[in-house]
Amino acid sequence: AIICVGYVDDRYTQDIHYKGGCLLNDNFWWGNIMLAYMCRAIDKEIKPDTWYEESIKRLEEMPLWPENWLNHQTRDEYWKHGSVSVNYDDINIPVFAIDGWADSYTNSVPTLMQGLNVPRKAWIGPWAHVFAHDGAPKPAVDFLGEATKWWDKWLRGIDNDCLEGPQSTVWLEDSMLPETVHVVSDGRWVGVDDWSQINDKVMYMTYGHLGETENINAEVVELCTLPNHGLLANEWMGAGVPG
């Protein structure tokens, strides 16, 4: 069985590298963080006799990830590695998928649910790139309890209610004033059983509200925007930062 949290099923279209073919800034900060991670020495407790030599070899052969990603700006063979969307049928065991709206990987939850043909369930909460029991912004959920039930059913053969309810449990956010940190997200939980049945609805903007019919009257709206307006925006893919 599988539990995946904050994941992608397509490394080219859903990851932090390219969106719609456009290069994302995240290539550079994440690539450099990985550079720092890979520079760390091997734990002496694990390799007491060879930790130094293996650490030096790692430094000598270490790739520069931003360079690798920039060398593959279109979908090619490079991105197939780790992209289960290439063939969802390769997965033949139950899957529990979890992510949050404040993370950057939420598109992968509905695409994975639609692509799989195995027992599956999903959560999408209001959270950033964190585990759901830490849930920021709140409300958090009992991820550890649900994970235990998932493992109990599929690894230990214990009958329980882990598949009861909708296939996907999703946090439907209400409109909120912009803040640099949202400690609590306003909204409610809803259930989705079939993502392919979700349809788009076209709404037309008019003065003060959205309407279902196009407004043919000319309107003028004057905005006085503060120069620091962008400072109030939330961070995309907040990696453990509350809100």
Please describe what each predicted stretch is.
Residues 17-23, 111-116, 137-143:
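Short secondary-structure boundary/capping segments
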Residues 91, 97-99:
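Short beta-strand/loop motif that positions the catalytic acidic residue
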Residues 138-243:
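C-terminal, loop-rich substrate-recognition/catalytic regions characterized by aromatic stacking residues
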Residues 128-140:
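Catalytic histidine-centered segment of alpha/beta-hydrolase-like enzymes
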Residues 117-131:
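Catalytic histidine neighborhood in serine/cysteine hydrolases
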